[in-house]
Amino acid sequence: MHPTRFCSTRSLLTALIALFSAHAAPLSAQDSTQVASPSPAAPLDPRLAKLKAEALVMVESRAKQVQEIVDMLFSFQELGFQEFESQRYITTLLAKEGFSIEKGVAGIPSAWTAKWSYGTGKPEISLGSDVDGIPQASNKPGVGYRDPMVSGGPGHGEGHNAGQAVNIVAAIVVKQLMQRDKISGTLLLWPGIAEEQMAGKAFLVRAGIFKNTDVTLFTHVSNDLGVSWGASGSSALLSAEFRFRGSSAHAAGAPWRGQSALDAVMLMGQGWEFRREHLRLQQRSHYVIKDGGDQPNVVPSTASIWFYFREQDYPRTMALFEIGKKIAEGAAMMTDTKVDTIAILGSGWSAHFSKPIAQAMHANVQTVGMPKWDDKDQTLAKGIQKELNSPDFGLSEQVNKELRGAETPQNWMGGGSDDIGDIAWNVPTITLRFPSNIPGLPGHNWANAISMATPIAHKGALAGAKVQALTMLDIMLTPKVVADAWDYFRNVQTKDVKYTPFIRLQDTPPTYLNADIMAKYKSQLQKFYYDPTKFKTYLEQLGIEYPTVRAQVAQPKGNDGGGKQ
């Protein structure tokens, strides 16, 4: 923000400084209840309070930039390992802001890092968020029913188009304050590449991207604004492709001369189904046939099946993998084929998040609060909820006052995964959930794309950027936060657990994934790229009236403004 802007907002700054100065110190957690409770009030450092107040105003002044980044990445709609338009756009933006750019890191062509340092360069804060989309999730934003932009095309059905806006705007604001006030530190921005394939972050760790990092602040879209600490409740995951080799023959003329690799693949899948009954209820496992042969009249000489193995932790997940290898060998024996290769395509440890960093961030969540949704936002949310036969309670309006802690092992019942776990077991890490999506949706679905280039996404990302900026300032100016984070990391989190990567030295990023899908749809997707020089919003470019819902869920007009916190 230009210095003259501060003069016009002096009264707001004064009020914000008073608010921060009166705030309690970071909350202390009670391990026995897994809920953080307030500690006795302690005023913030006046300098930190002033900087935080300024940061809130500066982030708010960049609401337009948040909207443009969110909408631009939504319009690219790229799948994992093919995020090249996103790379070009983001790195160009950050280079103009003075960040040093490195592309193709960790052997991943679509990956990148952006770094900026001042003074001693310490502490180093890494800021990450995923960028990849979901196959067949194309849908027009702001439309509360199925209406693809590109039929069969990919889309942001996980909402990964919004998190980079949170990090970029927060980083630009904090960088300006660091320069002006001569605050030492390093900002390292990076994307979560191919998160849906769980195939990016472990390779970033192996490449040493975070070797100098003090704290990682990760962001992920949600329908609330919050953070948690301890065991995340996510599953560990190992992604592996089993490739079989046999010999071809005429499927009708001389089938007895062939050894069908496809038969082996099908037997492996069936064998896993029989074994599934005798596995823990908490495990999750799924597979698809990636290569089933070329045509029916040729006995397939090669075929492959791609598995996701999920369990509570590294040992249990590896045990599933070992079972899978035994079943593969059995399938090969039954079909007189061979297990040609077993490639680990990706992986993710079950995440464990830093309590001290979460405590600092939670206090900032309370300060920022949820966005002010208007009637149009709520109408869209209730419209898609009703469309999917979910409870139509609309958007959440309150943040959780309690800081939730570690999930107890006996209550763990399995679920999804996120490869942020590999980073979290190497450096103190938290994930900020920011409210750019709608509650009650299925996830990994076209419905989850509907809000992601609308005022809901813009307001949610702006709130996230405010929390992120405030937490970065806590880390920069309160050495105890970093010291406590590493004390927790060494003496609690990793006291009895040693990180061992799932990926082996011979495993490389499977950057070929999704190339064929993107090649198929690229020319159609390009027609929908956002042009912010011609249109204020992506909705305007698409000619979509916000919100568009089925008539029975439309509500009377009310306040259609607001959105500022």
Write out the residue ranges for each language-model feature.
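Sec/Tat-exported extracytoplasmic proteins
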Residues: A55-V66, V70, F74-Q77, G98, ...
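Bacterial N-terminal signal peptides
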Residues: S11-H23
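Divalent metal-coordination and catalytic microenvironments
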Residues: L73, L94, A114, L127, ...
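N-terminal secretory signal peptides that target proteins for export/translocation
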Residues: M1-T9
